[in-house]
């Protein structure tokens, strides 16, 4: 997945949701958006993950793919925290929707005994951000931790 393929289309949208995980593609897209559009009125919702936080990283999972996923989400969360402070007086808004385990194809076979969020619950948090008249730095949605 080459994020550069999306760059030329971003200007046309006022609302952008970065949800797909492919290594650092979310980070690259977000960085591009901030660099090019920080003075434009846009709402960017980034779906991160509690796996990218110290408190919810699951140390029991040995899979390298999970560790890699968590590492990229952690980097993304740190960037969002930093950039939100810089953008506080700018028209560009960045929202971090940080769900715990979501019942999707990606989580099948993992955390089989844990309560999982439904995708609709995450989409309601996204909707809240899009409709919000104020800035929301991070929404953490949890059932597990």
Regions found by a protein language model. Name each.
Residues 1-12, 25:
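Conserved Rossmann-fold cofactor-binding substructure of NAD(P)-dependent oxidoreductases
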Residues 12-14, 41:
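Local beta-strand N-terminus motif with an aromatic residue
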Residues 20-30, 43, 126:
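Conserved internal alpha-helix within the Rossmann fold of NAD(P)-dependent oxidoreductases
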Residues 1-4, 31-42:
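Eukaryote-skewed repeat-based solenoidal scaffolds used as protein-protein interaction platforms
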Residues 96-97, 111-145:
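C-terminal helical subdomain
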Residues 19-21, 38, 42-88, 98-104:
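Catalytic loop of short-chain dehydrogenase/reductase
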Residues 30-34, 77-83, 123-126:
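Short-chain dehydrogenase/reductase
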């Amino acid at each position: 997945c080459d994020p550069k393929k999306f760059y030329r289309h971003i200007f046309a949208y006022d609302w952008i949701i970065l949800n797909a995980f492919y290594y650092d593609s979310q980070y690259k897209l977000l960085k591009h958006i901030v660099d090019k559009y920080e003075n434009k009125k846009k709402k960017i919702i980034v779906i991160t993950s509690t796996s990218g936080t110290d408190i919810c990283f699951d140390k029991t999972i040995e899979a390298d793919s999970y560790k890699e996923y968590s590492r990229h989400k952690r980097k993304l969360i740190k960037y969002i925290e930093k950039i939100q402070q810089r953008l506080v007086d700018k028209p560009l808004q960045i929202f971090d929707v940080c769900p715990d385990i979501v019942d999707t194809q990606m989580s099948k076979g993992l955390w089989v005994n844990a309560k999982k969020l439904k995708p609709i619950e995450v989409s309601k948090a996204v909707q809240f951000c899009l409709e919000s008249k104020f800035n929301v730095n991070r929404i953490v949605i949890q059932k597990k931790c």
